[in-house]
Amino acid sequence: MPQNCIAPRPEEDGGVMVQGLPDMSDTQSKSVLAFPTITSQPGLQMSMYPITLKFEEVVYKVKIEQTSQCMGSWKSKEKTILNGITGMVCPGEFLAMLGPSGSGKTTLLSALGGRLSKTFSGKVMYNGQPFSGCIKRRTGFVAQDDVLYPHLTVWETLFFTALLRLPSSLTRDEKAEHVDRVIAELGLNRCTNSMIGGPLFRGISGGEKKRVSIGQEMLINPSLLLLDEPTSGLDSTTAHRIVTTIKRLASGGRTVVTTIHQPSSRIYHMFDKVVLLSEGSPIYYGAASSAVEYFSSLGFSTSLTVNPADLLLDLANGIPPDTQKETSEQEQKTVKETLVSAYEKNISTKLKAELCNAESHSYEYTKAAAKNLKSEQWCTTWWYQFTVLLQRGVRERRFESFNKLRIFQVISVAFLGGLLWWHTPKSHIQDRTALLFFFSVFWGFYPLYNAVFTFPQEKRMLIKERSSGMYRLSSYFMARNVGDLPLELALPTAFVFIIYWMGGLKPDPTTFILSLLVVLYSVLVAQGLGLAFGALLMNIKQATTLASVTTLVFLIAGGYYVQQIPPFIVWLKYLSYSYYCYKLLLGIQYTDDDYYECSKGVWCRVGDFPAIKSMGLNNLWIDVFVMGVMLVGYRLMAYMALHRVKLR
C-alpha cells in the first residue's frame, strides 16, 4: 500500500510544527507518487495551512466552428484540450508541467486554480474538498504576463496589494513590515523604490517584474502557488534565479505547480515531479529524476548527454532522440501514440490505484481558522477597499492626470475660442448662442473620449485582481469614478473661466457660476457614457468607433444646426445630452422677455429669435432631471457591463 502525504499541523499559537514525512527510500522506485521533505529555511515564512492537490481524469473540450464545404454553412466540432490528466502534489513539492506550445499546460493550470471559464469533467480536490472561496483565499496564481501598474514603485505595488489582501486585523504598520519581509525574501531590495515601468518608459527588469508578481501572491502566504510560464522571455541566469526562488517557497511547505516551456538543465533538476503533455494527453507523470530512465526503458534512449527537458519536449512532439533527419508527420503521430499507450499501461493504472488508496486529505485547519475563513467573504470592509483603491488610483495616475499636453490642449483651445469670440456684442445673439453651443459640444465630447479608454485599458488588471478576490467590484468602480474627478472638473473649470469672460457673456457672478455648474454637469454625464461604452465593448477600437458615431448624432441633434427636425426622428434630440446642456446654458443667459438690438435702432424680443424659440427656455428643471437620469443611468450601465467581464 502506498504511503500518504502527512501534513504539518498548525500549532495553537499560529506557528508551524513540521512533522516527519515517511521515508520513501524503499518504495520510491516502485511508487508513482513521490513525496518531498519539508525543511524550514532561515527567513522563509512557512505555510500555515498546507494543501494536498489531487486531480483525476481531467478532461476539457471546446467547440470550434468550421465552415462546411456545402453552401457555406457552419458546423460545430469538439476539440479535446485536456484528455484524462491525473496526478497529486503534496506540500513542499514542486511540480512542473512540460509540453510543446498548445499541449494544454496553461489550461490545466487554470483548471487547478479554479479559473477555467467553462466546465470540465474529472475531479480536482484540495485536501479532499472541491474548490471554494476558502481554498481561493489560500491560493496564489501568477499569470504568464506581469500585469502591474507602471507608475507605482515596487514597494507601493506590494504595499497596496497587502492593504487589500491581508486581513483587517493587521495594522497598516504590520502590513508594511510584512511587505518588507517579502521584498527581502525575493531579493528585491535594490529596486524597492524603482518604478515598475511600461511600454513608454523604462522601469525594473523583466526578472524583477516577475518576482514582484510572485511577491503579490506571497503576501497572503499561500498554501497553493500556481505559476504560468514564470521564466518566459527571461535570460537563462534570470530564469534560474526565479526558479530558485520558487523552489525555496516550495521548501516552506507550500504546494507549487508551474508550467514551463523550455527549462535549462539546471532548472529541470530543481523539479520534484514532472507532468509531460502531448496534444492534451499525458505521456509521463512522476519524479523528474526518473523521466529519462522511464523513456529509455521504452526504447527512447539517447547516446548523447542532453538536457532532460529537451529530450522530453522532443518526445512530446513525436521526435525520437538521436534523429538525424526530419521526421514525417506520420512518424511523429506513431511516436505520440506509442507514448500515450505506454503511459496508460505503465503509469496510469498504477497512479489511479495509489490515488484511490491515498487518504482524501491529511491536513486539518484549526477550528478557529476554518471558522474565520468560511465566515469572512472579504478580508476588508467596503469603505476600506474604496479608500485604498482611491489612494492607489490617484498615485498611479498622478503623472497621467495633470499631463502637460492635456493642460496645454485645453488652455490653448480656451484662449483661441476667447479670441474668436472676443467681447461679442449683445446684439450679435447668433454668435453668443454659438459660443454656448461650443461649450456644450466641447465638454460633451472631450470627457467622453477620455473615459472610453478607462476600463479597456484596465481590463487585465481588473480580471487579475478580482479573480484573486482582492476587492468588491462596487468599491473599485466608485474609486475609479471619484479618482478621475479632479482632472475631469479642474480643466473645464479653467476653460470656462477663460472663455466666458473673454467672450463677453453676461458679466454676472451668479450667471457665471450657474453656467460653470451646467458645463461640469454635462462633463459628468459625458464621462458616464464613455465609461459605459468602454465597459460594454472592452475594446478600445470598437468603443471609440461607437463614440464617434454617437457624438456626431448628438452634435447634429443638439438643437443648433438643425432647428426643425422632422417629426419622425425628433425623438433623437432627447437622447442628446448636448441638447439639454445647450438649452440650460441658453436659459441661464437669457429669458424670453429679454431684448437685443436686432438692427440699428430696432430692438427684438429674445424669445422670438429662431434658434432660441425652437429650443424654448421654459421647464429647465425637467432638463436638469433628465441629465441626472443620464448621469446615474450611464454609470449603472457601465457597472452592470463590468459584472459581465469573465474573470477566468
UniProtKB/Swiss-Prot annotation:
GO terms for biological process: cotyledon vascular tissue pattern formation; cytokinin transport; cytokinin-activated signaling pathway; defense response to bacterium; export across plasma membrane; export from cell; response to hydrogen peroxide; stem vascular tissue pattern formation. ATP binds at G99, P100, S101, G102, S103, G104, K105, T106. It is found in: Cell membrane. Induction: Repressed by hydrogen peroxide H(2)O(2) in a CRF6-dependent manner. InterPro entries: AAA+_ATPase, ABC2_TM, ABC_transporter-like_ATP-bd, ABC_transporter-like_CS, ABCG_dom, ABCG_transporters, P-loop_NTPase. The chain crosses the membrane at residues 405-425, 435-455, 485-505, 512-532, 543-562, 569-591, 620-640. Accumulates primarily in the pericycle and stelar cells of roots. Expressed in leaves, stems, flowers and siliques, and, at low levels, in roots. Accumulates in the phloem. Residues 53-304 form the ABC transporter domain. Keywords: ATP-binding, Cell membrane, Cytokinin signaling pathway, Developmental protein, Glycoprotein, Membrane, Nucleotide-binding, Plant defense, Stress response, Transmembrane, Transmembrane helix, Transport. It comes from the Eukaryota. SUPFAM superfamilies: P-loop containing nucleoside triphosphate hydrolases. Disulfide bonds: none annotated. It is a multi-pass membrane protein. The keyword Endoplasmic reticulum does not apply. Pfam families: ABC2_membrane, ABC2_membrane_7, ABC_tran. Gene3D superfamilies: P-loop containing nucleotide triphosphate hydrolases. Residues 384-590 form the ABC transmembrane type-2 domain. GO terms for cellular component: plasma membrane. Glycans are attached at N346. Forms heterodimers with ABCG11. PANTHER family: ABC TRANSPORTER G FAMILY MEMBER 14 (PTHR48041:SF111), ABC TRANSPORTER G FAMILY MEMBER 28 (PTHR48041). Positive regulator of plant growth which acts as an efflux pump involved in the major root-to-shoot (acropetal) long-distance cytokinin (CK) transport via the xylem sap. Together with ABCG9 and ABCG11, required for vascular development by regulating lipid/sterol homeostasis. Involved in CK-dependent responses to oxidative stress such as hydrogen peroxide H(2)O(2). (Microbial infection) Required for SNC1-mediated defense response against the virulent pathogen Pseudomonas syringae pv. tomato DC3000 by promoting the accumulation of trans-zeatin (tZ)-type cytokinins (CK) in the shoot. Belongs to the ABC transporter superfamily. ABCG family. Eye pigment precursor importer (TC 3.A.1.204) subfamily. This is ABC transporter G family member 14. It comes from Arabidopsis thaliana. The gene is ABCG14.
